[in-house]
């Protein structure tokens, strides 16, 4: 069985992301396994400029729509009971999780 598990989390809502990270930290603290992280990765900003007037007559006015993607990485020891508890964590719809066994 692999020794470590790498958990990657990303979301557009930083509050929901921190909520899930705190749940994972609570599980790790209760079980006593080693943990490294959460490591915040750079926030990716995506901008889409859109012209307000679709026909293009008159002044060209632009609106900018922006979305930020926040990411975290957590490395933990891959203990069987910890992994079972991680599968039971309630995750909001806008938070995505990827677990990789290293």
UniProtKB/Swiss-Prot annotation:
SUPFAM superfamilies: Ribosomal protein S10 (SSF54999)
TM region positions: none
Gene Ontology molecular function: structural constituent of ribosome; tRNA binding
Highest taxon above the source species: Archaea
PROSITE patterns for this protein: RIBOSOMAL_S10
Gene Ontology BP term (one): translation
One Pfam short name: Ribosomal_S10
GO cellular component, one term: small ribosomal subunit
Keywords: Ribonucleoprotein, Ribosomal protein
Keyword Nucleotide-binding: no
Family statement: Belongs to the universal ribosomal protein uS10 family.
PANTHER family: 30S RIBOSOMAL PROTEIN S10 FAMILY MEMBER (PTHR11700)
Task performed by this protein: Involved in the binding of tRNA to the ribosomes.
Assembly mode: Part of the 30S ribosomal subunit.
Stated name of the protein: Small ribosomal subunit protein uS10
High-level lineage: Archaea, Thermoproteota, Thermoprotei, Sulfolobales, Sulfolobaceae
Gene designation: rps10
